[in-house]
C-alpha cells in the first residue's frame, strides 16, 4: 500500500454543505473508489484557508488514473463542482503534497 496526500480548495462558506454531501455519499461511489484500489481515505479541512487535505492509501495495482473516465466519478465531480474549485476536466483542482515526515 502506498499513502498519498493532496490539497483541494473549498469555496468559502461551504464547509457544512461539503460535510453533508459526504455524510450522504453515494454507495456506488464508495464501490467505485474501492474498486480503484483506494483505502483508508480521509479529508481534513483547514477552515482558515478553506483548503481540504486528503490522505489515502492505495493498492500497488490501483486504478486511480482511470477514475477520470468513470461515469459515477464524473457525476460526483459535477455534483460537487458548485462548492469547490475544479479543473478544466471537471475534477476537483488538486495539488499533490510531498511527504516530509513519517513515524512508523
From Swiss-Prot:
One GO MF term: L-rhamnose mutarotase activity
Record Pfam families: rhaM
Signal peptide: none
Catalytic residues (positions): 22
Keywords in alphabetical order: Carbohydrate metabolism, Cytoplasm, Isomerase, Rhamnose metabolism
Catalytic activity: alpha-L-rhamnose = beta-L-rhamnose
E.C. number: 5.1.3.32
GO cellular component: cytoplasm
Transmembrane annotation, as ranges: none
Pathway: Carbohydrate metabolism; L-rhamnose metabolism
InterPro entries given in the database record: Dimeric_a/b-barrel, L-rhamnose_mutarotase, Rham/fucose_mutarotase
GO biological process, one term: rhamnose catabolic process
Source domain of life: Bacteria
Subcellular location: Cytoplasm
Positions contributing to substrate binding: 18, 41, 76-77
Statement: the UniProt record of this protein carries the keyword Transmembrane helix: no
NCBIfam families: YiiL_rotase
Subunit field text: Homodimer.
Function statement: Involved in the anomeric conversion of L-rhamnose.
Family: Belongs to the rhamnose mutarotase family.
The protein's name in its UniProt record: L-rhamnose mutarotase
Lineage: Bacteria, Pseudomonadati, Pseudomonadota, Betaproteobacteria, Burkholderiales
Gene that produces this protein: rhaM
